[in-house]
Amino acid sequence: MSLGLLIVLVIIVLAYVYGSTDHRETIRVAGRDWNVLSDYDNAAAAALLLERTHAKMIRFLAYLKDKYHVNETDEEIADCATHPHDTEQRRIVTALLDGYNPDVFYENRPGTNGTSYTINKGSAMYICLRNKINQNKLVDPDMLMYVMLHEASHIANYNGWGHEKRFWEVFKFILQNAVESGTYPPIDYSKRPEDYCGLHVNYNPYFDGALANIDM
């Protein structure tokens, strides 16, 4: 993707986001403020859902940091023969650790374009939390974790944009580690499709044997 096209796309997204009429409020849960839509009676429950998903992500990120020896000295890394200093896995994990920022998470309204999306590798993340038909019904926590890992993979995919093949390989790598860490239960959506904010989900790269693995 050319820089000019990328700039145009960012401008379009920002114009959509900041030109919308959505009103949000900040609700404090577990010492952190969450930006959720204010025109629902269960806004506090939405903030709690975000907090619980974030807590899973924090455990997952700590697992990745430890497994791939991020921010360790060269000497410490050298003592672990299975994970040398410069590997593709460490670059992916480092990009995710550097870019993940819950302070710029915002609830996104169901039925809007994109359902959930990330701007500029983590500058902002808009996350749909509600059923499209019954908007007082919050999404399933496991589905939300899958979506959060999807958005996290956009951050981790440090040298790519969009949903090209490389993104799906990175997403598979992230899912494999999330399952290994115990923070995400693998769900085969090809066998058990689910609705997410009006989007029909019928694919999980974790189960795609034709998709290349990034060695863990």
Predicted features by range, described:
Residues D140-M145:
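Helix-boundary capping/turn motifs
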